[in-house]
Amino acid sequence: MHSFGYRANALLTFAVTILAFICAIASFSDNFSNQNPSAQIQILNINWFQKQPHGNDEVSLTLNITADLQSLFTWNTKQVFAFVAAEYETSKNALNQVSLWDAIIPEKEHAKFWIQISNKYRFIDQGHNLRGKDFNLTLHWHVMPKTGKMFADKIVMSGYRLPNAYR
């Protein structure tokens, strides 16, 4: 006969093995979900565009963000982190990213939204590189599952340009 300790160890090992197997299947099942998020971002107004006293350019924008991220949610999704970034190139850096807005979306019911806001975070370039600059607005998202690996993706919207003169 085996002692109580041996039996408890066998039962615990079996339970952990089954739990690991269920987690692996849950993570694997996310690969079969049909994800087709959509988004549109409009710049409604440039509130101000100025040069700060220490020489950096700063922009304040009013954005209209429309997104449908409901297809990112499966039974294994805990939450989705979404953010909008302005992306542009300068002579010193091939890619500059400035986060303008972000949100944590906890449920599928909140994943379809329309908001009109001024940028939540300051759009500042370290230098004076923003006058007349073309830039993209990109909606990034990170899907955080209950079990398994996180994944991220984005939608890039191009064709935006800042004015040539400060306002």
From Swiss-Prot:
Membrane topology value: Single-pass type II membrane protein
Glycosylation sites: 64, 136
Stated name of the protein: Signal peptidase complex subunit 3B
Chief location bin: endoplasmic reticulum
Function: Essential component of the signal peptidase complex (SPC) which catalyzes the cleavage of N-terminal signal sequences from nascent proteins as they are translocated into the lumen of the endoplasmic reticulum. Essential for the SPC catalytic activity, possibly by stabilizing and positioning the active center of the complex close to the lumenal surface.
Family: Belongs to the SPCS3 family.
Keywords: Endoplasmic reticulum, Glycoprotein, Membrane, Signal-anchor, Transmembrane, Transmembrane helix
PANTHER family assigned to the protein according to its UniProt record, in alphabetical order: MICROSOMAL SIGNAL PEPTIDASE 23 KD SUBUNIT SPC22/23, SIGNAL PEPTIDASE COMPLEX SUBUNIT 3B
Residues in the Lumenal compartment per record: 33-167
Location of this chain's protein in the cell: Endoplasmic reticulum membrane
Gene Ontology BP annotations: signal peptide processing
